[in-house]
Amino acid sequence: MASQVVLSFALVVVLAVFVGQVDSCPSDCKCDYRSSQCRPANDDVHPNVCIDHYCVVMNLAKREQRPELSPGALDDSSEEKDNEASLA
């Protein structure tokens, strides 16, 4: 009996994870995770295309990946040395 409860709970958790990642917006729309409503993906899309479409969100909002910085991109010391050399 206890194993059935654990198994059914695990199934509910697995389904919740899969459902939480479903984005049911039309292709020209994107999910607004705060309101769970579909919004136009860009200015060319008419707002009525996305009306009455909702997206199911049960997990944290998707995070956009930040672009990778090349090594030394934040190192301003070489630029400062070049500026000092040109002033001398």
UniProtKB/Swiss-Prot annotation:
<protein>
    <recommendedName>
        <fullName>U-scoloptoxin(XY)-Er1b</fullName>
    </recommendedName>
</protein>
<keyword id="KW-0964">Secreted</keyword>
<feature type="propeptide">
    <location>
        <begin position="79"/>
        <end position="88"/>
    </location>
</feature>
<keyword id="KW-0732">Signal</keyword>
<dbReference type="GO" id="GO:0005576">
    <property type="term" value="C:extracellular region"/>
</dbReference>
<comment type="similarity">
    <text>Belongs to the scoloptoxin-XY family.</text>
</comment>
<keyword id="KW-0800">Toxin</keyword>
<keyword id="KW-1015">Disulfide bond</keyword>
<dbReference type="GO" id="GO:0090729">
    <property type="term" value="F:toxin activity"/>
</dbReference>
<feature type="signal peptide">
    <location>
        <begin position="1"/>
        <end position="24"/>
    </location>
</feature>
<feature type="region of interest" description="Disordered">
    <location>
        <begin position="66"/>
        <end position="88"/>
    </location>
</feature>
